[in-house]
């Protein structure tokens, strides 16, 4: 970094002369060091898949949950700083329950994601705080049908047919842009998602224990069991 940019590097609320917020950019770099995760829509639902890398043989594998239940028909997968992700997941759960109690209907996923994004955006413009070092993919079913959004450290949100976050994002997105098509069955979507994750691996790496979850129209959140996952590897 050039000497003249150092002052802007330390201040979260000050733009550099070329319009950059360096702390937000650094938060995005933290996401790039996280596990790869993806989401994609299929014919009557939406799917989340995450690579779950086990860093130590001493860790209980079942204790590492990358895909999180928000509501019966909404889930999220995260990549980046785990503690930051936990705070935002709890925020999303509370927001979803408040809406459900107030309106008594399916949670509007776009509104939910906007509330989480607003929370993240606030941490890019006030002194004494830092941006959340995490990105999230939200997937679920609402009144419109299957929905899929992502949200980054700046609080930017987009809706997708298929998307990815984490260290292998570029490779996964490149693969999906070539191979994804609308109208896939759930089985076809899982097969495609696993292939996309494998395309992001370094030479010599193996996809050993991915997490897979789906939500379909009329059916609640479902996490795939270990034996189900093995069939797709």
Swiss-Prot record:
Subcellular location: Cytoplasm
InterPro entries on file: Ntn_hydrolases_N, Proteasome_alpha, Proteasome_alpha-type, Proteasome_asu_arc, Proteasome_asu_N, Proteasome_sua/b
GO cellular component annotations of the record: cytoplasm; proteasome core complex, alpha-subunit complex
A Pfam family the protein falls into: Proteasome_A_N
A single GO molecular function term of this UniProt record: threonine-type endopeptidase activity
Keyword Cytoplasm attributed: yes
Control of this protein's activity: The formation of the proteasomal ATPase PAN-20S proteasome complex, via the docking of the C-termini of PAN into the intersubunit pockets in the alpha-rings, triggers opening of the gate for substrate entry. Interconversion between the open-gate and close-gate conformations leads to a dynamic regulation of the 20S proteasome proteolysis activity.
Keywords: Cytoplasm, Proteasome
Source superkingdom: Archaea
GO biological process: proteasomal protein catabolic process; ubiquitin-dependent protein catabolic process
Keyword Cytoplasm tagged: yes
Family: Belongs to the peptidase T1A family.
Known role: Component of the proteasome core, a large protease complex with broad specificity involved in protein degradation.
Assembly description: The 20S proteasome core is composed of 14 alpha and 14 beta subunits that assemble into four stacked heptameric rings, resulting in a barrel-shaped structure. The two inner rings, each composed of seven catalytic beta subunits, are sandwiched by two outer rings, each composed of seven alpha subunits. The catalytic chamber with the active sites is on the inside of the barrel. Has a gated structure, the ends of the cylinder being occluded by the N-termini of the alpha-subunits. Is capped at one or both ends by the proteasome regulatory ATPase, PAN.
Name recorded for this polypeptide: Proteasome subunit alpha
């Amino acid at each position: 970094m050039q000497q003249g940019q150092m002052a802007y590097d330390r201040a979260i609320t000050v733009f550099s002369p070329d319009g950059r917020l360096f702390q937000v950019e650094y938060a995005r770099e933290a996401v790039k060091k996280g596990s790869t995760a993806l989401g994609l829509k299929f014919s009557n639902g939406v799917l989340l898949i995450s690579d779950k890398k086990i860093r130590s043989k001493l860790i209980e594998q079942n204790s590492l949950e990358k895909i999180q239940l928000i509501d019966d028909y909404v889930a999220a997968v995260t990549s980046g700083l785990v503690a930051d992700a936990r705070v935002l997941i709890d925020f999303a759960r509370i927001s979803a329950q408040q809406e459900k109690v107030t309106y008594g209907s399916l949670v509007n996923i776009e509104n939910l994601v906007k509330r989480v994004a607003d929370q993240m955006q606030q941490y890019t413009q006030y002194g004494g705080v830092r941006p959340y070092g995490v990105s999230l993919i939200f997937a679920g079913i609402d009144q419109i049908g299957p929905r899929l959004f992502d949200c980054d450290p700046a609080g930017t949100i987009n809706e997708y047919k298929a998307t990815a976050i984490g260290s292998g994002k570029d490779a996964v997105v490149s693969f999906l842009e070539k191979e994804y098509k609308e109208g896939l069955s759930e089985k076809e979507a899982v097969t495609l998602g696993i292939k996309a994750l494998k395309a992001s691996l370094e030479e010599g790496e193996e996809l050993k224990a991915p997490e897979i979850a789906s939500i379909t129209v009329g059916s609640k959140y479902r996490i795939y069991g270990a034996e189900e996952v093995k069939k797709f590897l």
